[in-house]
Amino acid sequence: MAEQKSSYGYEELLACARGEMFGPGNAQLPLPPMLMVHRITDISETGGEFDKGYIRAEYDVRPDDWYFPCHFMGNPIMPGCLGLDGMWQLTGFFLGWLGEPGRGMALSTGEVKFKGMVRPHTKLLEYGIDFKRVMRGRLVLGTADGWLKADGETIYRASDLRVGLSKDSEGQ
């Protein structure tokens, strides 16, 4: 298991994506370009909105990011689903960070609201994930609420983000 730190840099997140942080068969982040986090600035097992733990992270937006030319030509916008996926990525990372075994999978979310867009001129995305509960059984299930800020303005909110870790999920 990884040393339980309160922040992680990009190279450490890449190590997690390669399966080197939490051990074989356990939680991993995706590799770029699907990795939607550049650094975890704070993570704790306590605190947050529900006092069940939280994670804060950042993503540096670049005008030449891969999604801008194709979504949409002449009207570049980061797909909202990528911000939502970043929230799921962080929820799964938290479960692995807690030392829970198994491979991660996004399961569902309650309500998602988009109130703004990420454009090429946007500089910084900030994520906040506040945990409501972690259930431990055959499947480890994390439930959290999340938000995404673009240059300091909250533009996405998601309730009841659910990510599971399963020991039965074999990598192919």
Curated annotation (Swiss-Prot):
Its EC number is 4.2.1.59, 5.3.3.14. One of its GO terms (biological process) is unsaturated fatty acid biosynthetic process. The keyword rRNA processing does not apply. It catalyses: a (3R)-hydroxyacyl-[ACP] = a (2E)-enoyl-[ACP] + H2O; (3R)-hydroxydecanoyl-[ACP] = (2E)-decenoyl-[ACP] + H2O; (2E)-decenoyl-[ACP] = (3Z)-decenoyl-[ACP]. Keywords: Cytoplasm, Fatty acid biosynthesis, Fatty acid metabolism, Isomerase, Lipid biosynthesis, Lipid metabolism, Lyase. It holds the Pfam family FabA. Belongs to the thioester dehydratase family. FabA subfamily. Homodimer. Necessary for the introduction of cis unsaturation into fatty acids. Catalyzes the dehydration of (3R)-3-hydroxydecanoyl-ACP to E-(2)-decenoyl-ACP and then its isomerization to Z-(3)-decenoyl-ACP. Can catalyze the dehydratase reaction for beta-hydroxyacyl-ACPs with saturated chain lengths up to 16:0, being most active on intermediate chain length. This is 3-hydroxydecanoyl-[acyl-carrier-protein] dehydratase. It comes from Brucella anthropi (strain ATCC 49188 / DSM 6882 / CCUG 24695 / JCM 21032 / LMG 3331 / NBRC 15819 / NCTC 12168 / Alc 37) (Ochrobactrum anthropi). The lineage of its organism: Bacteria, Pseudomonadati, Pseudomonadota, Alphaproteobacteria, Hyphomicrobiales.
